[in-house]
Amino acid sequence: FAATAGAQDTKVAIGISGWTGFAPLTLAKEAGIFKKNGLDVSIKKIPQKDRHLAIASGDIQCAATTVETYIVWNANGVPITQLVQLDKSFGADGLAVRGNVAKIADLKGKTIGVDAPGTAPYFGLAWILKKNGMTMKDVTVATMSPQAAATAFIAGQNDAAMTYEPYLSGV
């Protein structure tokens, strides 16, 4: 990727969300690391559920997302290759619940704000429910972005919110 004298920078648009783990991309842009290496990078905030559409349309050339999302996209005909793993998350995701939910089984029949199928929050919620003898059919899903799920939960909407940092600590 090293830039050559007089060469024009290669334009690259990267789609990200507000998830903390994607911050190194913005930091690299702001620090001039991409530019120094011959890349003219633009960072676009695009919800995870829409990033595959932005890739397919050519609006972006790269997408920062989770590993399971790459698998889903490939399975659905979006030919992509994972280039790098930015980080490993051990605790940035979480399920916020109201005071009347003492155990996961108490979520049966409740409404949970969670991102679309194929996203990390959706996968996380499905995993939590499965580990507790439940499925997604046992709850009512209100599909919304992780930020919107946290905001709706704070506003008193929904019984729970599956989200991640930086939104999780606000609920």
Model-derived segments and spans:
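N-terminal signal peptide c-region/cleavage motif recognized by signal peptidases
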Residues: A2-T4
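Short, glycine-/small- and polar/acidic-enriched structural segments
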Residues: A7-A148, A152, Q157-S169
